[in-house]
Amino acid sequence: FVEYSKNYGCDCGITVCGQYDEENEFHVEYTFPFFRGTGITTQEHVVVERHSEKESYAGACDDLRLGVTLIFYLQNLAEYMQEKYKGLKDPGDRPVTVSGLASEGKILFPLQKDKEAVKVERELSKNRTNLIAAARNGDEEAMESLTMEDMDTYSMISQRIVTDDVLTIVDSYFMPYGIECDQYNVLGEILDIMKFKNILTGEEICQMTIESNDIQFDICINSKDLLGEPAVGRRFKGTIWLQGQLHY
């Protein structure tokens, strides 16, 4: 099994996967677009499973910050298979870098928050993550605390939704989209922006680092599919195909 990757911009391009036969002739099995992100997104336990229709793989891990199972399309397939043939059955707690290819997106204005509110919000998020971890281990008090917290949140939203817009109440979200398990609808704050040209088509590509539900990752989108002008501090809302790279 062999994979070839060709960059058409900054860490984005096309990967061709296939096999060589006995006469050393390459046979293409499938291709997919890729975008490689930066940094380490998560170091939770990762499980990798093969797709039924072809020799491609999906990774999954439970990150408590999200509240949902993070499922991504594995980018470095050849490297994973090489490690697998060496006897590594499970990648375990390998660092993972996830990134998103966005099919469409919008730029939203940020919510107005002071430094103290941001500090309190981060502390509450950290406490909630600890409660979820404890609840998974059977802690009944943690389960009760989470239930009460959800009820308070529901009550607050029910009151504010009468006068406020949903995107004014919700700062960010990360939730599954459609029937494909590795597609998500995300809303997050833009932390960094870089624009470049596709060297083949000349189209402008916008690459952004966003923070959604306390998780930072990079996304890539064709500028013509993006509504609004991106800027640091504003928010990105859109649909992404989540890809991931295991680090060995």
Spans of features found by a protein language model:
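Long, hydrophobic alpha/beta structural blocks
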Residues: 2-178
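Compositionally biased accessory segments in Actinobacterial proteins
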Residues: 188-193, 239
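Eukaryotic intrinsically disordered and solvent-exposed regulatory patches
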Residues: 175, 194-196, 224
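Short nucleic-acid-contacting surface segments enriched for D/E, G, S/T with interspersed K/R
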Residues: 223-238
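Short amphipathic beta-strand/extended segments with alternating polar/hydrophobic composition
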Residues: 72, 218-223
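Short, Lys/Arg- and Gly-enriched loop/turn segments at beta-strand edges
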Residues: 241-248
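Short coil-to-beta-strand transition motifs
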Residues: 177-189, 234
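OB-fold (S1/OB) nucleic-acid-binding surfaces
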Residues: 191-219
